[in-house]
């Protein structure tokens, strides 16, 4: 997964409030066993994650994950310095242009996947992150993408 998603990778992030879903595209970075998103505490996604941590990620290449999200804090918090370093490198072309670390409401969201599907080199992988199992099978991505 690090090979595919351990870089700036765009997903649609879905959250929900009062059983009403909301989706938006976000830049993510996968590190360790989690996806990370840079955002603002007052954004709709952060507010919804605070109330309901159940989220999903998907992209047009059919990679999809469900999991639990948590706001892990402000980027200048020393406890998350290691992930900040990784995020500033992964998002180098735009990180400091679009984020203000002097803003006390800037934050990172960590998404710990519980289940997911991705494919690479003709193999599909169905993952259960909770049970730490993976099922591999032949897979051809033959969806015609329409812009």
Describe these PLM feature segments.
Residues 6, 20-21, 42, 48-50, ...:
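Short solvent-exposed loop/turn micro-motifs enriched in small/polar/acidic residues
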Residues 10-11, 23, 27-34:
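Short, basic, glycine/proline-bearing loop/turn elements
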Residues 21, 35-36, 116:
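Hydrophobic residues embedded in beta-strands of well-ordered beta-sheets
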Residues 64, 68-147:
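Charged, gly/pro-rich active-site loop segments
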Residues 29-63:
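A short mixed-secondary-structure module that forms the rim of ligand-binding clefts
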Residues 3-18, 55-58:
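A short, Trp-centered hydrophobic/proline-enriched beta-strand micro-motif
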Residues 9, 24, 53, 105-107:
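Residue-level marker for the onset of beta-strands and adjacent loop->beta junctions
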Residues 2-5, 17-20, 27-29, 47-48:
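Short secondary-structure boundary/capping segments within folded domains
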């Amino acid at each position: 997964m690090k090979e595919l998603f351990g870089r700036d990778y765009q997903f649609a992030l879905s959250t929900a409030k009062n059983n009403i879903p909301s989706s938006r595209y976000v830049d993510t970075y996968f590190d360790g066993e989690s996806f990370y998103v840079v955002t603002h505490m007052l954004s709709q996604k952060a507010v919804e994650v605070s109330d309901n941590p159940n989220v999903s990620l998907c992209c047009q290449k059919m990679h999809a994950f469900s999991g639990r999200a948590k706001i892990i804090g402000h980027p200048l918090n020393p406890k998350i310095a290691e992930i900040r370093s990784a995020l500033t490198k992964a998002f180098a072309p735009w990180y400091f242009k679009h984020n203000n670390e002097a803003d006390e409401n800037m934050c990172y969201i960590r998404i710990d996947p519980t289940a997911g599907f991705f494919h690479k080199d003709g193999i599909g992988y169905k993952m259960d992150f909770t049970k730490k199992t993976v099922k591999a099978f032949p897979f051809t991505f033959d969806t015609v993408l329409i812009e």
